[in-house]
């Protein structure tokens, strides 16, 4: 009887033990969502690791494009990061503004991400709204999903 109780207890405790999460070995990712790819209504970004903590990204959205350099807090593509991003909103006659600034990106261990930061205006186009003409800083934000490749 003691052996049976001991076996049951060992089995119960062994089920509860969990190993450490294995970090992603993937070195690239694609993200898509609202205000991704340079701040377009919808867009996508392609990101690739340059080294242990650094990565680069480039993206395109609905009449927008952007690029950036990122520093990941952990040396994995699926970790949160801080970035220096360039957003170019509008193309040709629809060009509104170009922004450059720091952004914090939160990445959940799987799929979900969001960004928030500030962008300094480095260019204005013919379609910039009158209310934004004298505003030197703009809030940069986006929400979406990412998929390590």
Give names to the regions the model predicted.
Residues 105-106, 120-131:
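Membrane-helix boundary connector in multi-pass membrane proteins
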Residues 1-25, 149:
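Cleavable N-terminal export/targeting peptides
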Residues 95-116:
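Short, positively charged, low-complexity/disordered linker segments
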Residues 69, 105-107, 134-149:
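Outer-membrane beta-barrel "beta-signal"
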Residues 64-66, 97-99, 138-142:
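Short hydrophobic/aromatic beta-strand or adjacent loop that forms the aromatic wall/cage
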Residues 26-38, 42-67, 79-90, 114-122:
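Transmembrane beta-strand segments that form the barrel wall of outer-membrane beta-barrel proteins
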Residues 24, 50-52, 73-77, 106-112, ...:
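Outer-membrane beta-barrel strand-turn architecture
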């Amino acid at each position: 009887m003691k052996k049976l109780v001991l076996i049951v207890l060992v089995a119960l405790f062994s089920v509860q033990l969990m190993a450490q999460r294995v970090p992603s070995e993937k070195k690239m990712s694609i993200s898509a969502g609202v205000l991704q790819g340079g701040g377009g209504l919808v867009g996508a970004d392609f990101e690739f690791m340059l080294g242990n903590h650094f990565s680069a990204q480039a993206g395109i959205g609905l009449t927008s494009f952007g690029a950036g350099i990122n520093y990941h807090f952990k040396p994995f593509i699926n970790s949160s990061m801080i970035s220096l991003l360039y957003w170019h909103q509008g193309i040709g006659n629809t060009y509104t503004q170009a922004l450059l600034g720091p952004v914090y990106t939160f990445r959940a261990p799987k799929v979900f991400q969001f960004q928030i930061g500030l962008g300094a205006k480095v260019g204005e186009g013919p379609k910039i709204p009158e209310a934004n003409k004298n505003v030197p800083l703009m809030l940069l934000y986006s929400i979406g999903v990412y998929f390590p490749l």
